[in-house]
Every structure is written in C-alpha cells, then in structure tokens.
Amino acid sequence: MYKKNIKIRNLGLRRIQDVCSSMNDFTITRKISTPDEIWLVQHYPVFTIGVSGTKHDVLVSNNIPIIFSNRGGKITYHAPGQLIIYVLINLFRRKLTVRRLILLMQNIIISTLKSFSIDSYILNNFPGVYVNNKKICSLGLRIRNGCSFHGMALNINMDLLPFEYINPCGNSFKMTQVIDIKPNLCFKIIKLMLMHKIREIFS
C-alpha cells in the first residue's frame, strides 16, 4: 500500500543546467514506487525562458545568461536569495489533477508567508503568489507521464533589479520579496517554515 511520504533535498547554490539535467533524469527514470521528492535550491543569476516565452521577453540581458527551459510559462529570473522549489510528484499515485497540484503549491507559499504575518493571494489567470499587487512567487510546471517537475521560485532576499530587464512571465506585474516586507526575516528561517508546510500538505 502506498504511503504518502515525501523526501526533501537541500541542494544549496547550484548551476541551473546541472539541476535541470538531474531533474529530467529523475523524472524519466522514476518508477511507480519511486518516492516523491521536493528539491530546494538557489541558482546563480540566469534568465530562463519557458515553452510559452521567446527572446523578445528579454528587454536587456546585461550579460546575464539566457537559458531555454521545458517548463511551462514565459520568462523569469533566478539568483541567489531566491528559494527554488522543484516539485517532483506522481500525480496519478496521489490522485491529483494538475490544477489541484498548482493550488496546493500556491497554498504552501501562502501558508508559509502567513506564518510571518505576510498576507498573500493568488490571481485568476496569473499563476504564482502575490502581495500588494506585486508578485512574490513565480510558478512554472511540466508534467511527463503523470509526474510533475519544475516548480516555484520564492523571492526572499535577492537583487530584484534584473526583473526590470525582462517582461517577467509575460505580464507587467512588479516583483517584490520577503525582505522588503519583513526586513528582519532571514532566508534560513523562511526555508525551515516552508519545509514544515510542505510536510504538512504532502506527507
């Protein structure tokens, strides 16, 4: 009988190419018995363009690498101080629709932020999580053989300026981050709370 457990891996600061290669390999080779995993990681500065995006979404690259990704969505920016949450879930086994998985993922972020008295919300037709009409968390998924990969990016304490160089996720929302709302919070405390919320929802 299947037990709803989940493994959380803390990968530290890694090149996005290396992590995406490992994530693709994990998804392609996983079996029905393979435990679901969540990977927490930070990436070096990089723009990633999803399957719905084009290079026209880059206004100025400013020597930041641009990488095409097989995730859903358009363009976004990753850098240290942003917590990437890769969600490697077998939807069939958990009896989840894609829509339900996305709601669960967004609720993890909302619940985590609520723990620090930050009120956040979702918007119809605009995936992600928002605070005061600014985006604090981006979301882009891919499903292969009933299993999810890619995930979310929560802005915590990073340089937001490069978001001005792009049309993020194909919309005009400004970006925000936790440190701008609650300056005394640190990356580690937020990550620990997020891990707790992940286990609450997926275990």
UniProtKB/Swiss-Prot annotation:
Q: Which GO terms describe its molecular function?
A: lipoyl(octanoyl) transferase activity
Q: Which family does it belong to?
A: Belongs to the LipB family.
Q: Which residues form the active site?
A: C169
Comment field (misc): In the reaction, the free carboxyl group of octanoic acid is attached via an amide linkage to the epsilon-amino group of a specific lysine residue of lipoyl domains of lipoate-dependent enzymes.
Q: In which pathway does it act?
A: Protein modification; protein lipoylation via endogenous pathway; protein N(6)-(lipoyl)lysine from octanoyl-[acyl-carrier-protein]: step 1/2
Q: What does this protein do?
A: Catalyzes the transfer of endogenously produced octanoic acid from octanoyl-acyl-carrier-protein onto the lipoyl domains of lipoate-dependent enzymes. Lipoyl-ACP can also act as a substrate although octanoyl-ACP is likely to be the physiological substrate.
Say which species the protein is native to.
Answer: Buchnera aphidicola subsp. Baizongia pistaciae (strain Bp)
Q: Give the location in the cell.
A: Cytoplasm
| Record key words, sorted | Acyltransferase, Cytoplasm, Transferase
Q: Which GO terms describe its biological process?
A: protein modification process
Q: Which InterPro entries did the record assign?
A: aa-tRNA-synth_II/BPL/LPL, BPL_LPL_catalytic, Octanoyltransferase, Octanoyltransferase_CS
Name the record gives this protein: Octanoyltransferase
Any Gene Ontology CC annotation: cytoplasm
Name the SUPFAM superfamilies for this protein. Class II aaRS and biotin synthetases
Q: Which NCBIfam families match?
A: lipB, PRK14342.1
Broad class of where this protein is predominantly found: cytoplasm
User: HAMAP family this protein is in?
Assistant: LipB
Enzyme Commission number, as recorded: 2.3.1.181
Q: Domain BPL/LPL catalytic, which positions?
A: 32-203
